[in-house]
Amino acid sequence: TSSPLFEQPSIVVTPHLGASTREAQDKAGDTIADMVELALAGEFVPFAVNVSAGEVSETVRPYQALAEKLGGMLAGLSAGVPQESIEISYDGQIAEYDTRILTLSVLKGFFGAVGGDPVSYVNAPQLATEHGIEVRPSQSTTPKDYVNLITVRCGDHGVAGTLAGLNSVPKIVMIDDFTLDIRPAEHMVVVRNDDVPGMIGKVGAAVGEAGVNIADMVVGQNEAGVSALMVIATDEDVPDEVVAALAAKESVRSVIRVRG
């Protein structure tokens, strides 16, 4: 009780009843130090008393980063905070596990992309409540094209992703009901356009002329086949004036910057 930590108003001290030997106490201290390091880095802290996420399985853990990216992309597509709800679907084997931490990750990514105060696993649900957003998670063990799939939606927008291959590479496989396959990137532009010839060249030329390198590009089509959705990953942000110029082109319906 002589430690100066007891005098800090921001620290709540509780007894550790499970460590009855010196060796056990040392291990408990190491665990606490590891947890503090994770918290300071903004990462998920297992066993945190103020995070309602349950025990995170090794099957679910690799999907945390993907879920956060999906939340951030959804925020970009919806141009901020929606008015009603965020729907989160977990399909496949992952639905057999506790996915609460993934729901927190989606919210953390969403509100982190919206901007404002720092967002954590602790305050993300509170932010949803403050904005009047109902969070609707659902689970189905029936696979949808992939062994595991996470889909997030709000309003007219939606994004789905999975982890592919032995190295669990993150993939975005659906945006606004357009099927595609692209790795999430820090700088991305989503272009909605009529499905007519020459659009890839027009968009690529406009971005290239601005001196922005295109690292990846993919085009998705919906079932109707009358429109297409182009996703471009770039090495840096596409300038505002280029986004405006793209949006003004014939046959282009919308241009949105997102962060994956």
Task: Name the predicted role of every residue range.
Residues 53-260:
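A conserved regulatory-domain signal marking ACT and ACT-like small-molecule sensing domains
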